[in-house]
Amino acid sequence: VYKRQHMYSYIFPQIYQSENATRDTHPALFGITKILKVEAMHRVTDYYGPIIYKNFADAGKHYRPDTQKEVYYEFFNELDSAVVALTSYVEANPESNGFSRFDILLDGRYSSWIKFANSLRMRLAMRISAVEPDKACVEFQEGLNNEYGVFEAETERVAVSTKSGYTNPLGELNLVWNETYMSASMESILTGYDLSLIHI
């Protein structure tokens, strides 16, 4: 429940504001926002099933939740929008690297974000392959055949860079707040198997 509350209290409102602020004036940032939105929210629907997605901030529709099928279809639509926006921007501004100073996930190139979108599309297609194989096949091929490609090498990954001094917030929770504990399940496993790790 905490994950869902956190998402709707802090993350989704920022995404919503970013979409509205960039839609007509900053197409590349709009595309990146869409990708991050899908990346963040697909985990939420996989945990909870139906979620408020298309009707977020729409009081007129009473914030009606979408079915998981509707959410996944919207994910693919939003990745379409992201790829179109980024591709158009890259083709019109091939030397642009204005985002590189702020990109702490990838290498600062807009083309890498298109790769991310394509790879994410393939991942989501695999998630629905057992229940909607035809849709999954279409979406998988869409990502695979995009001219900008997909992540193939181990070095091509989305990870938070610590070069600018950014540190993992779990370090703050553990070292400063002193609120990170072993779970009861983990303790039972270590104790049950009489593993020496329990004494470290």
Regions found by a protein language model. Give the residues of each.
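Structured, solvent-exposed acidic/aromatic patches
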Residues: K3-I198
